[in-house]
């Protein structure tokens, strides 16, 4: 039967910041009466509901704050794609033990094979596990650091970048860096080394990163620290990005970032 809560109870729940319980409590009480659930067990169920809700809300906020692509999650990776990589290694990375061990991840491969997708998917898992994550393209990172020098906020920005549990730098080493940018990246790699996890995606192997830095000694020191504490995930194969192209269907356009499983076209009767 339908049950309404007493206004006094609703007011008390809201005062304790338990307002969301109001929507589910009547159903839980009805279930408890039907199944002869004790008050203690009912209280546990109700509080478990609220804990789950708060965890879900917190995870959603962490994902938003991280700047992750919302659709680049493990469940949406198209397993039929002709992109090749070490599935066993990626499964290990999905366990997030590398985050707990403060190890790094280097994701290498040509343009369009899904490096960003797999990096973001790891970021989503880390957010769900209550880790703080930041995803940022390398060019945007360097812009923020340049701006921070101008407005005297560099120390605060560097502290933020060094303290986040998982920092994902996308498309690193595409363009040469200035002397200041090289020093910034050196400091970032060195201060995060063995203290927090860094995921880097790049089209270039670490040996090709050296000319990108303005200072060869800084480059060698930074790269050596990063790569010797990193898992290497190497991707190869056909472009995964082509699967994210907009497609026409009876249901309208698919959301951006959602892969389309391609099928072989069937021959019409008239073509036979």
Question: Which sequence ranges carry the predicted segments?
Answer:
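Charged, compositionally biased N-terminal leader segments and the immediate start
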Residues: 1-21
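Conserved adenine-nucleotide phosphate-binding loops and their immediately adjacent elements
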Residues: 65-79
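Walker B motif beta-strand of ABC-family P-loop ATPases
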Residues: 166
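Conserved P-loop
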Residues: 85-163, 210
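Interdomain "pre-motor" coupling segment immediately N-terminal to P-loop NTPase/helicase cores
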Residues: 14, 18-69
